[in-house]
Curated annotation (Swiss-Prot):
Tissue expression pattern: Present mainly in the central nervous system, especially in the supra- and subesophageal, thoracic and abdominal ganglia. Not found in the distal part of optic lobes.
Keyword Glycoprotein: yes
SUPFAM superfamilies in the record: Family A G protein-coupled receptor-like (SSF81321)
Glycosylation sites: N13, N198
Any one Gene Ontology molecular-function term assigned to this protein's record: octopamine receptor activity
Biased composition (Polar residues): 253-280, 361-378
Cytoplasmic topological domain residue ranges: 78-87, 148-167, 238-411, 471-484
Transmembrane segments: 55-77, 88-109, 127-147, 168-190, 216-237, 412-433, 449-470
The protein's name in its UniProt record: Tyramine receptor 1
Keywords of this entry: Cell membrane, Disulfide bond, G-protein coupled receptor, Glycoprotein, Membrane, Receptor, Transducer, Transmembrane, Transmembrane helix
Superkingdom of this protein's organism: Eukaryota
Described purpose of this protein according to its UniProt entry: G-protein coupled receptor for tyramine, a known neurotransmitter and neuromodulator and direct precursor of octopamine. The rank order of potency for agonists of this receptor is tyramine > naphazoline > tolazoline > DL-octopamine > dopamine > epinephrine > 5-hydroxytryptamine. For antagonists, the rank order is yohimbine > chlorpromazine > mianserin > phentolamine > metoclopramide.
Amino acid sequence: MVRVELQAASLMNGSSAAEEPQDALVGGDACGGRRPPSVLGVRLAVPEWEVAVTAVSLSLIILITIVGNVLVVLSVFTYKPLRIVQNFFIVSLAVADLTVAVLVMPFNVAYSLIQRWVFGIVVCKMWLTCDVLCCTASILNLCAIALDRYWAITDPINYAQKRTLRRVLAMIAGVWLLSGVISSPPLIGWNDWPMEFNDTTPCQLTEEQGYVIYSSLGSFFIPLFIMTIVYVEIFIATKRRLRERAKASKLNSAMKQQMAAQAVPSSVPSHDQESVSSETNHNELPPPPAPPSKEKRRKTKKKSKKKEQAAEEGRFLAPAMVAEDSVTDNSVSVGPVARNHLAEDGYTCTTTTTTTTTTTAVTDSPRSRTASQKGSTAPPTPVQPKSIPVYQFIEEKQRISLSKERRAARTLGIIMGVFVVCWLPFFLMYVIVPFCNPSCKPSPKLVNFITWLGYINSALNPIIYTIFNLDFRRAFKKLLHFKT
């Protein structure tokens, strides 16, 4: 409550003192009384500089909250990759946060600056009810998102069949229905609001102890407990999957080394990406490749010309692939897998057989970009084929998956950290104040700061839940007409 104290003003002769009402100072007096700050004729309770800083700061928070949550809603309904059932939880969360920004925050800004409620008792009751409703819906939507992620991770096959549009909409309806059940009791009498209401009566949440316990449990402490258990389980499952994928990555590396050892003889230095091999045993040599058809040679020649043009412009560098050995009456051929990759990229393989030496060369243009070597003493040229072997592809996919799992674990920590930092101070204050004596009550500025700390969670939610999602980032850029 803002108490307007009457100030004693000294008379010119000093014989007596008279009290002047605060209204007399609004227009100033003959003795040079200072005019209190006002906006549009409404007296303010704080200095003008504080009014400006507070108004700009809080208005910026409101603007960020509105823009961010509107972008989330539009992204889900306009960007096709985001039109999936689980994203309706994000839409429900965005709607709750949007109502906080539109229906709750502006009245709090005015109340913070004026320090009096000038909108009447009906608007006061509706504002407080809307405050509890929307903030509770925002928190319960966070809880629903946590449960959805938990079921999707711990039971992915069964939950994928259960996660239907009807089920998701039913969960969202339950969130809003439960929020209404928690926020509505003060409207039907469970409150300690005064019977008479004027502009000096504070518009504040009821401090009726029974309702405070009831609403704080339903709005925060029970959802916090559920989210903590769920995210701990998700974190444990994520760490377990990280360990499993790390083991799979090590196994894949061992398989890669084994395959490389089998593909390259001991007399020839092995390379992870080498695709050419030769053996001295006639029985172990693969049969020479069949000569390509005229049509295939024509297409290969055409592709080779394109590769050569690119090379001349400095945009392409053909890999040299050479493997040789001294054998008698044997032909050395490129393995079938490597040959297929080379044919796709426009390379041609030529094999020359003599009685003393075998030369295998790979050319990438009609100008005979050929690397060859005769004799068995020269070391082979390292091979760098353009195509990626299967085991390298699997290893790359596992590496990407490990990176995603680590980011997911880090995201869980950010979600819980932001939620607790924003809302825990408010609900601790909300529960403690009704049970303590007047001397332990916090100052109005501290109350306002803690309240807005909770509101800020509505501005951060669209950032947290979308900044780590590539599809949402693309949708935002598309909506804002940013070039990607």
